[in-house]
Amino acid sequence: MHQVISATTNPAKIQAILQAFEEIFGEGSCHITPVAVESGVPEQPFGSEETRAGARNRVDNAQRLHPQADFWVAIEAGINDDATFSWVVIDNGVQRGEARSATLPLPAVILDRVRQGEALGPVMSHYTGIDEIGRKEGAIGVFTAGKLTRSSVYYQAVILALSPFHNAVYR
């Protein structure tokens, strides 16, 4: 059984990680241990590079806390231009897989507050009345009318980031 350290305690992110690992390696093939670690970037990262750095830092910090795991996984959400997205970083101590999620354009009223220094989650909670929306369906669920959720979009990115770990062409 794969021991997977999730560098987050966010249920939406953990669900995506578990589903993706089970899709690739088989149901019941992994045990997820969530840990809270620092990203080393602002609470609301801006730009692709800052967001990817946050995910990489989380993986590195999780490896230091739990060096005996098989995989370390981080998902860092950020804002780039007028949209939200995330970076997924997966490491197994030998190689690293990274993938960027789909991008969701955000309304100007939301972006204005985020650009003034507020994090997306609390701004979305204010407009929707959904407490801790970032730990649930997220802005993605709201603006796609539930057709996609934060977890479902992250799932795809985790699948992509796992590609180097089960395809011999990458080795």
From Swiss-Prot:
Keyword Manganese attributed: yes
Cofactor(s) for this UniProt protein: Mg(2+); Mn(2+)
Reaction catalysed by this enzyme: XTP + H2O = XDP + phosphate + H(+); ITP + H2O = IDP + phosphate + H(+)
Pfam family, one: NTPase_I-T
Keywords: Hydrolase, Magnesium, Manganese, Metal-binding, Nucleotide metabolism, Nucleotide-binding
Binding residue positions for Mg(2+): 38, 68
Protein family membership: Belongs to the YjjX NTPase family.
Assembly: Homodimer.
Name of the molecule in the record: Inosine/xanthosine triphosphatase
Species per Swiss-Prot/TrEMBL record: Salmonella paratyphi C (strain RKS4594)
Upper taxonomic lineage: Bacteria, Pseudomonadati, Pseudomonadota, Gammaproteobacteria, Enterobacterales
